[in-house]
Design a protein with these regions (language model features):
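A solvent-exposed interaction/effector surface
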Residues: 26, 30-33, 38, 44-250
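Generic hydrophobic, amphipathic alpha-helix propensity
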Residues: 20-25
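HTH DNA-binding helix-turn interface
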Residues: 1, 6-19, 48-49, 58-66
Length: 250
C-alpha cells in the first residue's frame, strides 16, 4: 500500500520534510523583501535554532545571505517553493515586452496584509472596486499596485493601489489625481476568469511561473489593465475579468 509520503512526493516532487524546509525558506524570503522584520525575528519565527543556521540554509537555497537578499534592488524569484495547494499546472499567455511611459488619472487606495495571511488571495474588495470602476467610467481601467514594508508595523505589508484611466474626466467631472506608468521591460500575462481564479492568479505567477522561467523582478509597480468587456462577460452566471498583467523584470 502506498503511503501518504509517496502520494505527497508524487504531487510535489519532493519529500514532506524537504517541502517543509523549502516552504520555510521561501516564506522567509518573502518576509525579507516585503516586511521590516529583523533577520533574527524571521529566523526564529521560521523555527531555526540560530541566525547562523538560518543564514547557512538560506544561502544554500538562494545563493546569498539574508541581508544581501533583502538589500538587493531586485527580487530573484528562482528557487521559491510554492505551497502544495497552488495549481502550478495553470498556463497563461506570456511574453516579454517594453512599455512606454503613460499618464493616467484616477484614485488611490491602500490597505495592509498581515504576514500570517501569506500567501494572500487578492482582496474581494479589489474585485468589487474593479467592476464598479469599469461600470462607472465606461473605460478600460489600469490598476498599479506596490507591496512594501510598513514603517510602523513589522507584522504587516503595506499595499497601495492606484486605479486609473487614460482620460482625466468622466461624465463632465474632472479626475484630479494623475499618475505615470513607468516605461521599461515587463513580463506580460493574459488572464480571463472568475473571482476565485483571479484571487489566486498573482500567487500562481509569482510562486510558480516566474521561478520556472528564471525571471528576476526589478523594482516597480505591478500593472493590471482591465478590459471594459469584463463588465459584460459571464461564466456559469459568475462575473469574470479580462486583463493583461505586467510585472517589471530585468
Amino acid at each position: 500500500r502506498r503511503s501518504l509520503q509517496d502520494f505527497f512526493k508524487e504531487k510535489c516532487g519532493v519529500s514532506i520534510g524537504k517541502y517543509i524546509r523549502q516552504r520555510k525558506l521561501s516564506r522567509s524570503a518573502t518576509l525579507l523583501k516585503l516586511t521590516s522584520q529583523s533577520v533574527t525575528d524571521i529566523a526564529f519565527r521560521m523555527g531555526f535554532d540560530s541566525v547562523q543556521s538560518y543564514s547557512r540554509e538560506f544561502k544554500k537555497t538562494f545563493g546569498v545571505n539574508p541581508n544581501n537578499y533583502r538589500k538587493a534592488d531586485f527580487w530573484d524569484l528562482r528557487n521559491l517553493r510554492p505551497p502544495y495547494w497552488l495549481d502550478c499546472d495553470e498556463h497563461y499567455q506570456f511574453e516579454i515586452c517594453q512599455l512606454t511611459s503613460k499618464e493616467i488619472f484616477g484614485f488611490q487606495t491602500s490597505h495592509q496584509i498581515a504576514t500570517n495571511d501569506l500567501p494572500k488571495k487578492a482582496s474581494p474588495i479589489k474585485w468589487k472596486i474593479i467592476h464598479e470602476t469599469l461600470r462607472t467610467w465606461g473605460e478600460n481601467v489600469y490598476c498599479l499596485s506596490s507591496f512594501k514594508p510598513d514603517n510602523t508595523n513589522d507584522q504587516v505589508i503595506a499595499v497601495s493601489s492606484f486605479f486609473g484611466m487614460e482620460h482625466n474626466s468622466v461624465d463632465g467631472g474632472k479626475i484630479p489625481m494623475p499618475r505615470v506608468i513607468k516605461c521599461g521591460k515587463y513580463a506580460k500575462f493574459h488572464f480571463v476568469g472568475h473571482k476565485e481564479k483571479y484571487q489566486q492568479f498573482s500567487n500562481t505567477i509569482y510562486m510558480c511561473i516566474l521561478p520556472k522561467l528564471n525571471i528576476i523582478r526589478r523594482e516597480g509597480e505591478d500593472i493590471e489593465y482591465f478590459h471594459m468587456a469584463s463588465v459584460q462577460k459571464q461564466q456559469n452566471n459568475e462575473s469574470i475579468v479580462d486583463l493583461y498583467y505586467y510585472i517589471p523584470v530585468l
